[in-house]
Amino acid sequence: METLANRLDACQDKMLELYEKDSDKLEDQITHWHLLRVENALLYKARECGLTHIGHQVVPPLSVTKAKARNAIEVHVALQQLQESAYAHEPWTLRDTSREMWDTAPKGCWKKRGITVEVRYDGDESKAMCYVQWRELYVQNYSDDRWVKVPGKVSYEGLYYTHENMNIYYVNFKDDACVYGETGKWEVHVGGKVIHHDAFDPVSSTREISTPGPVCTSNTTPASTQAQVGASEGPEQKRQRLEAVDGQHQQQRQGSKDSTQKAAERAGGQVDSDRTRLCDTRSAHPVRHPSDPDCAPVIHLRGDPNSLKCFRYRLHHGKRKLYSRSSSTWRWSCESENQAAFVTLWYTSDTQRTEFLNVVKVPPGIQVILGYMSIF
């Protein structure tokens, strides 16, 4: 027990030295969070051994030290990844890398240079609320977990930043408008400027993803053109024209279907009807065909993005032989930023996946979804 007390004293002495140093280097902040991990691990072990005091220090309950250790691990891993980015040599203080800053909206990223944004609901100064707009935000890409710096923005709708062609709102003024206001309108005061409801552009402020896709070559006439043509036609002419357009659309759909099937046959031989049924999106529970050699067993891990990254990091360094490949953290594009993320694990066989589930303990809060995916 004396050794435990000495280690705890040495750990806390090093932390005090860092506090007095007040460094703005990222490596010192990483050291600080490493020491916090060690401190909570020692306190956890002391409590496990039945100690309630170490010298004059009270040993917290196991649940408290466990939660603090998890928080320290999460921030420590995030800072280690940040050190490998292009922003490692920027000034990083204890305040910039604190757990409070990590949890401040938007959660799970680093922020700097905050300014105050005042929102007056109903245009009434007595109903004003203040928010923080971060001029610089450091977020991770969903595709490769690489850190990038993006500017914080403000619109009539709320506070947001643009990442991977998507506007991500972390404060929506509409949510507070029904609490602090009555008319559902407000004014945004920032940097000596005022944003009114009349200046709100719902198109440019709407959160959306720009994804490449096929160019639409439909021959459908725009609604305005149809209205102009229909005004000069009689009922019989309208019916004949609509029948002709409908027949043309059916031919286009049939031609598109045939060309898709022929392309599949050219790429992979004869199209298997059973394989086609497996890819039927109308089925709630698709079943893998036993004779299909092109499907690999997978596990989709669903949960908090940061928890998934920490869990994947532990798997990569301790259980790498129990799975074939792992994906980066990803989300469905139609879901909001607050929705859960996914990490997909690939396996060479069902036996390997079963062994993984028998050996690896999945942390609470992470959902395991079994499935199969086409090998590519």
From Swiss-Prot:
GO function terms (MF aspect): DNA binding; DNA-binding transcription factor activity; nucleotide binding
Keyword match Transcription regulation: yes
Annotated spans, DNA-binding domain: 295-376
GO CC field: host cell nucleus
Listed GO biological process terms: DNA replication; DNA-templated transcription; regulation of DNA replication; viral DNA genome replication
Family: Belongs to the papillomaviridae E2 protein family.
Protein role: Plays a role in the initiation of viral DNA replication. A dimer of E2 interacts with a dimer of E1 in order to improve specificity of E1 DNA binding activity. Once the complex recognizes and binds DNA at specific sites, the E2 dimer is removed from DNA. E2 also regulates viral transcription through binding to the E2RE response element (5'-ACCNNNNNNGGT-3') present in multiple copies in the regulatory regions of the viral genome. Activates or represses transcription depending on E2RE's position with regards to proximal promoter elements including the TATA-box.
Protein name: Regulatory protein E2
